[in-house]
Every structure is written in C-alpha cells, then in structure tokens.
Amino acid sequence: TLDSNGKGPWAGNEFNHIEDTIIQQIFDFISLFKKYIVWVNTVELPKKSPISLIDEIKIDHFLSFNYTPTFLKLYSSASALSQKNICYVHGRLDEDSNAPIVMGVGSDFYNADLNEYFLKTFKFYQRYKYCTDLNFLNWFKEIRVEYSWAPSGQADEEFNVYIYGHSLDPTDKDILLPFFETENANIVVYYFDENSRFSLEKNLLKILG
C-alpha cells in the first residue's frame, strides 16, 4: 500500500537490507548444516544391516542426492562401482565442511522477473556455480547407444531405475524427469508405508505434470 506521497511501507534501501539478511541467514544455516553432516560422519553408530531387497539389486550406476557415501558403505553391490558411474549431484561432504553443496529451491519456482535477486538460492544456479557432479547426464548417452544396437530396440538387460530414500520432491524435477522420460525405462520406487506411498504419488504427479 502506498501513502499520499507514493511511497510504500519500506524504502528501497530498507527492502534491500531485508533481502540481504534473508539470504545471509539461509547460507548461515547451510554452513551449520554442513558442519553437522561432517560431525555425523565421525560418530560411531551401531552397525546397520543392509536391506536384503536392495542388496540383491545389480547396481551399474549410482546417483545420490545425499551428501555422504553411506549407501556405498552399506551395500556391497554399489561399493565396487567405478567413479564414472557414481554421481553426487548435490555435492559430497566427507571431512571438509567447506566443500560446496546444493541446497535450495527448485527451478519450477523461479521467475526471472520476481526472483532474480534470490537467484543464488536456486538449485540450478548452485549446480552451475559450484560445478557439482553432473556425470549422470553421460549415462543417458550410454543407454541410447546400448538400445540403438540391440535387436528390435531391446537391450540384453532391462534398463531399471530404482529410487530409494528420495521423496520425489519437485525441487529435483530437472534431474528426475529425464529418467522417467527415458524410453524403455522400468522405474521402481521403494516406500516405507502407505502414507509415504501417497506422498510419493502426489509428488510424482507434480513432476510428470
């Protein structure tokens, strides 16, 4: 609402200060979160047993949205993968809490006219700025080559995508959608209970549109 002089409740400098404060608090939280993750990695926890259903899967590639190698440590089928078949798309934290990570808002929420000032809080910009691992994009090229040489478009083995421990939140739509759109892909999503299944289904509908 403007007053009789055509001015709003905040002057331009005041509004800019509020924006700067919000952004600084967001990145202060991310900094504390990274320290917490590094600390958690040093804590000795009771040994966990792998889930047999997951452990029996033949894993050729591993895409992680987490920041730690917990899955690789727990599941032997993934621990032997070569580095080119492992991708920490949001960054990886081991002992260095200063390593950059992606933690922000999804690209679907970005409006260049409204959000330009907050660009640095969006995941797609953070991936660009921090040069996080996007090796998974090369996997699609390998898949297309494999299927192009297979008789009648059928490869020797099925192209299976297993999703475990991800909420399918639309903030990661730009990474998840290519998997769902890949021809001949068989998508398997693991869930904990019926409530989590319903939540996953809702998010999946948002991703697929």
Residue ranges, per PLM feature:
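A conditional alpha-helix N-cap/helix-loop micro-motif detector
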Residues: 43-44, 64, 141-143, 168-169
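SIR2/sirtuin-family catalytic core signature
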Residues: 148-209
